[in-house]
A protein has these predicted regions:
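C-terminal amphipathic "assembly/sorting" segment characterized by alternating charged
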Residues: 186-188
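Signature for the C-terminal beta-barrel architecture of outer-membrane proteins
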Residues: 2-184
C-alpha cells in the first residue's frame, strides 16, 4: 500500500474581540497531510499542517507544499500549525501512537537548549490502544496529552474587530479539548 495524501478546506466562523456574541463568516481553515506506511504497514509516519486566516482566500494553501515555509517566505500572517505523528501496529490488536505539533517556536534558543527563551507553543500526545478480539470491551486506551502556554492562540492585527487567526469556530476550540498550558492523562 502506498502513501496517503489528504487535503481539506473549511470555513469556520470568527468571534469578535470585544463582543463574544458577535461572529463573522470570513475565516478559512486549510489542512493537508501525507502518511507514509513503512515495514509492511506495521509502522507509519505522517506530516501534517493546517493554516487558519480570514477576510480573504489564499490559494497558496491548496498547494501540496510546506505551508510553514510558504507563510514565512511570503510574509503572510496566517497561523500555521505543523506536526508529525508516528503509529506502530507491530502486535495484533495493539497500537502505539505519538504526535508532536508545533504552533510556533523561536529556533535559535531552542537549538541552544534554552527552553525558557524558545517560546515553544505546541502540543504532544502519546498513547496505547488495545483492541481485543473477544472481550466485553471494544478497546482499552491509555493516553497522555500536554499543550504548552499560548498554543492555538494568535491575534490578527489587520482586523481590530474579529480574530481570524485563532483555531476556534464560534469561539470553541477546533483542536484538542485541552486548553493551552494544561495536560491530561486519559484511560478509556
Amino acid at each position: 500500500k502506498g502513501f496517503e495524501y489528504t487535503q481539506m478546506v473549511g470555513f469556520p466562523v470568527a468571534q469578535g474581540y470585544n463582543n463574544s456574541d458577535e461572529f463573522k463568516w470570513c475565516k478559512a481553515l486549510s489542512f493537508h497531510s501525507i502518511k507514509i506506511p513503512l515495514m509492511q504497514n506495521k509502522f507509519s509516519v505522517s506530516y501534517y499542517e493546517s493554516a487558519v486566516y480570514g477576510n480573504y482566500f489564499n490559494p497558496a494553501y491548496l498547494l501540496p507544499a510546506p505551508w510553514a515555509l510558504i507563510s514565512r517566505v511570503s510574509g503572510f500572517s496566517e497561523n500555521v500549525l505543523s506536526g508529525i505523528s508516528f503509529q506502530t501496529n507491530i502486535l495484533p490488536c495493539f497500537s502505539i501512537s505519538t504526535d508532536f505539533m508545533m504552533n510556533d517556536i523561536d529556533l535559535k534558543p531552542f537549538i541552544k537548549l534554552k527552553w525558557n527563551d524558545a517560546a515553544i507553543r505546541g502540543a504532544f500526545k502519546t498513547g496505547i490502544i488495545y483492541t481485543p478480539k473477544y472481550s466485553l470491551f471494544r478497546y482499552i486506551k491509555l493516553d497522555y496529552c500536554i499543550v504548552t502556554p499560548y498554543t492555538y492562540t494568535s491575534c490578527d492585527s489587520s482586523d481590530k474587530k474579529y480574530n481570524f487567526s485563532d483555531y476556534t469556530n464560534y469561539g470553541l476550540c477546533m483542536g484538542t479539548e485541552l486548553l493551552p498550558n494544561s495536560h491530561q492523562l486519559g484511560i478509556v
